[in-house]
Amino acid sequence: AKGKNTKKFAAVVDEEGGAVTAXYXF
């Protein structure tokens, strides 16, 4: 569950809440 999926998900979350991206910046 690490890699492209995580990066893509983080990008989507970044648009809604940049702070949340930090938690998904694996």
Curated annotation (Swiss-Prot):
GO BP: protein transport
Keywords, sorted A to Z: Membrane, Mitochondrion, Mitochondrion outer membrane, Protein transport, Transmembrane, Transport
GO cellular component: mitochondrial outer membrane
Entry keyword Mitochondrion: yes
Compartments in which it is found: Mitochondrion outer membrane
Membrane topology classification: Single-pass membrane protein
Superkingdom to which the source organism belongs: Eukaryota
Function recorded in the entry: Seems to act as a modulator of the dynamics of the mitochondrial protein transport machinery. Seems to promote the dissociation of subunits of the outer membrane translocase.
Subunit details: Forms part of the preprotein translocase complex of the outer mitochondrial membrane (TOM complex).
Similarity comment: Belongs to the Tom7 family.
Name under which the protein is recorded: Mitochondrial import receptor subunit TOM7-2
